[in-house]
């Protein structure tokens, strides 16, 4: 696809990830609550085995057309823009998945709903995530800078609302629906920030995106868990607050870089 259409193509990949979340998280939660944790793990095993077989049978061979040396790939780490992107992605993903790791517990402890209701709410989150991925491709194609800047603020506002309405299930469903859409958009934004920082090494950049995202999930889960240990489940969202406030700084630094200003001009011309 063309460079202009690349965000839309990437969003389709994230739609697949979200679709897995739509089915996987609620179904696994339901199996664990109604049968046993062991059966939930068996479900994971079966699904992964099927995916492995499908990959062998249906994913075509993709030979390398132009080799990029390891030195050339690693050289992108000399870019300040890349490091701003990496830190921003780590923080944003840490906020989203740090809290998401405890969302079921939050709904059970704070909102006080049954496990069946939790499964439905998680399904709503996953479906909203798909919608967010669809919107993300369009938003990045129209004005990437605007989408990237707004996202941390939108997520922060949503988590603040979630903290104050945690006891009311109707309000929680609405907030989680919004968070699902925003998370879908944010995932695409994060991937765009890193790959756009290193167009000369797209595969390496994509690897750095996954590394940063996973690092954020690990740290975010630990920080949100620490708030639960010290203050209670309700305050797990404070970890997301801290990560998002810090991410705003690095997103701002990222979009101020020369390459980003060039992209801004392209966005304006596109409008």
Describe each PLM feature range:
Residues 83-122:
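Extracytoplasmic gate region of multi-pass secondary transporters
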Residues 59-86:
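Juxtamembrane intracellular "pre-TM" segments in multi-pass secondary transporters
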Residues 45-65, 250-254:
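C-terminal membrane-cytosol helix-exit motif in multi-pass small-molecule transporters
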Residues 132-144, 228:
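Helix-to-loop junctions at the C-terminal end of transmembrane segments
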Residues 1, 185-198:
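Intracellular juxtamembrane helix-capping segments at the cytosolic ends
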Residues 1-15:
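Cytoplasmic helix-loop-helix junction between adjacent transmembrane helices
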Residues 146-190:
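C-terminal transmembrane helical hairpin of 12-TM major facilitator-type secondary transporters
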Residues 197-232, 240:
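A late C-terminal transmembrane helix in Major Facilitator Superfamily
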């Amino acid at each position: 696809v063309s460079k202009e259409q690349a965000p839309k193509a990437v969003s389709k990949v994230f739609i697949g990830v979200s679709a897995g979340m739509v089915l996987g998280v609620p179904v696994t939660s339901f199996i664990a609550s109604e049968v046993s944790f062991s059966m939930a793990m068996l479900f994971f095993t079966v699904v992964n085995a099927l995916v492995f077989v499908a990959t062998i049978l249906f994913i075509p061979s993709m030979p390398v057309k132009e080799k990029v040396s390891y030195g050339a790939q690693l050289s992108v780490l000399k870019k300040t823009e890349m490091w701003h992107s990496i830190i921003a992605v780590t923080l944003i993903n840490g906020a989203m998945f740090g809290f998401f790791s405890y969302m079921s517990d939050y709904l059970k402890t704070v909102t006080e709903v049954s496990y069946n209701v939790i499964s439905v709410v998680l399904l709503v989150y996953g479906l909203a995530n798909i919608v967010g991925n669809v919107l993300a491709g369009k938003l990045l194609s129209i004005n990437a800078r605007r989408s990237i800047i707004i996202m941390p603020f939108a997520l922060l506002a949503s988590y603040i609302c979630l903290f104050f309405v945690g006891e009311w299930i109707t309000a929680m469903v609405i907030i989680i629906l919004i968070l699902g859409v925003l998370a879908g958009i944010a995932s695409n934004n994060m991937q765009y920030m890193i790959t756009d920082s290193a167009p000369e090494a797209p595969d390496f950049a994509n690897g750095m995106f996954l590394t940063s995202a996973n690092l954020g999930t690990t740290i975010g889960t630990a920080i949100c868990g620490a708030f639960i240990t010290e203050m209670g489940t309700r305050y797990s969202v404070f970890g997301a607050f801290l990560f998002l406030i810090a991410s705003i700084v690095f997103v701002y630094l990222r979009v101020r870089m020369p390459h980003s200003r060039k992209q801004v001009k392209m966005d304006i011309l596109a409008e």
